[in-house]
A protein has these predicted regions:
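Stable alpha-helical elements in mature extracytoplasmic
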Residues: 65, 124, 188, 236-239, ...
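Autoinhibitory N-terminal propeptides
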Residues: 1-55, 64-104, 133
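Substrate-binding/access-modulating region of protease and related hydrolase catalytic domains
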Residues: 224-332, 337, 348-376, 384-387, ...
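Short strand-edge motifs at loop-to-beta-strand transitions and within beta-strands
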Residues: 57, 339-341
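Subtilisin-like serine protease catalytic core
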Residues: 102-234, 251-252, 285, 299, ...
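Short hydrophobic/aromatic beta-strand micro-patches
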Residues: 34, 60-62, 357
């Protein structure tokens, strides 16, 4: 504050940090204060007072009264406001994108297909239109709208750039959605695509553009006609297949963004979805990007090594899972040296799924103990499904063969 008061008006105009809060026309300063007592008397002296909670206030002070106000015993602390910036204003530079978009390299995505497999897109958003108002979206496949699926697929409806342009030329939103009825209800896909490829036409001087503002776009809205159903991995596989096939057809390099995911599987890359993604990533020139980190601290997964008694006793170790802390210690002390694996189930959860994956060659047996202490007995590792009742809890069990490429076997 002292530095701003000492600076000239020319210096303040050149440095936003110095000019923040100063009005050169009214010669007033806006300041933030913490105070004690009553500040009502300041209104009579030409100071506008806006009282906040917990003895904070915003003052609009004539420049001639600044020294007087700062010396008041009622003012515990005074602070000059600071300019705010959009938090994403520097996202491109801190992601090291700006250097590759300088005049020498000019890598803005021209000639590249960028596919967004998500919740859809607001195709009328200016960031996804060229300067002449036509769409940058080559294909839009909405899997939730039955009727006109792409060739080779059996769900949803696909819309071409020509159809989207006809919709954009409509005079009303009602006419537009009658031609191309796809909507991004949640807005997630639109936001993701804006980060990846928005051209900034909706912001002044294209300041808020995405990473590849000149890329050609392919959009797939995952889902079902029933909005209550969640998208499935089978639909995700078809979406990726659709995008890769189109890129091969038009002979363009392709980048696919996937922001969907789940917590199933052994996380060893052996599921059919994972092996398929690995396989198609080698076709043509394509890069598949997935979201990560949203559940990094939720403890959804656990891995560990169980000590084997085979060398000392020749016995196969028994592993028991329990949600009862009291039962845990009792099980751990049994004669066959069982290991307790505790898992938590919230009181509000009426159902949930738990998968246990083991190395294929290892032999284990499992006993479940309910919160009430009811034991299932040793569950035999017999392939197939079984049903079990532990008090009020119904269990549906499955012991499965490992997939052809897997190194682990699962018990669900």
């Amino acid at each position: 504050m002292n530095l701003a008061l000492a600076a000239t008006e020319v210096e303040r105009r050149r440095v936003p940090e110095l000019s923040a809060g100063y009005n050169s026309y009214s010669k007033t300063w806006e300041v933030i204060v913490q105070y004690q007592g009553d500040l009502a008397f300041l209104e009579e002296q030409g100071v506008r007072v806006t009282l906040l909670l917990f003895s904070y206030a915003i003052l609009l002070v004539p420049e001639s009264l600044m020294d007087y106000v700062t010396e008041l015993p009622q003012i515990t602390y005074l602070e000059k406001p600071k300019p705010l910036f959009f938090a994403d204003a520097f996202a491109r530079s801190v992601s090291c994108i700006s250097p590759v978009q300088e005049e020498i390299s000019g890598l803005y995505g021209d000639g590249v297909l960028l596919a967004c497999i998500d919740s859809g897109v607001d195709y009328a958003h200016p960031d996804f239109c060229a300067s002449d108002g036509t769409s940058r979206i080559a294909l839009l496949w909405d899997q939730t709208i039955p009727g006109k699926p792409p060739t080779g697929y059996a769900l949803g409806s696909v819309y071409t750039r020509q159809q989207i342009n006809e919709a954009l030329a409509s005079s009303t939103p009602e006419e537009r959605f009658a031609l191309v009825p796809s909507r991004d209800v949640t807005g997630h896909g639109t936001a993701v695509l804006g980060i990846a490829a928005g051209n900034g036409r909706s912001s002044a001087d294209a300041a808020m553009r995405g990473v590849a503002p000149e890329a050609t776009l392919v959009v797939v809205k995952l889902g079902n006609p029933d909005p209550a159903d969640l998208p499935r991995t089978s639909q995700l596989l078809q979406a990726v297949d659709f995008c890769v096939r189109y890129a091969l057809l038009v002979e363009r390099p392709l980048v696919i963004n996937l922001s969907f995911g789940n917590n199933y599987g052994s996380h060893s890359g052996d599921s059919l979805l994972e092996t398929y993604l690995n396989a198609v990533s080698n076709l043509g020139q394509n890069v598949i990007c997935i979201g990560a980190g949203n559940e990094g601290d939720t403890g959804r997964h656990y891995a560990g090594n169980l000590k084997s008694d085979r060398k000392s006793s020749g016995q196969t170790q028994t592993v028991r899972a329990t949600s009862d802390p009291a039962a845990t210690s009792a099980v751990s002390a049994t004669a066959d040296r069982a290991v307790s694996v505790e898992f938590q189930v919230g009181a509000y959860e009426s159902s949930f799924s738990l998968q246990i994956w083991k190395v294929y060659g290892d032999e284990i047996s499992i006993e479940l103990i309910s919160p009430g202490g009811i034991r299932s007995g040793t569950l035999s590792p017999v392939l197939g499904t079984a049903r079990l009742t532990l008090g009020p809890t119904e269990l549906l069990l499955f012991y499965g063969m490992h997939p052809p490429t897997a190194r682990r076997r699962k018990f669900t």
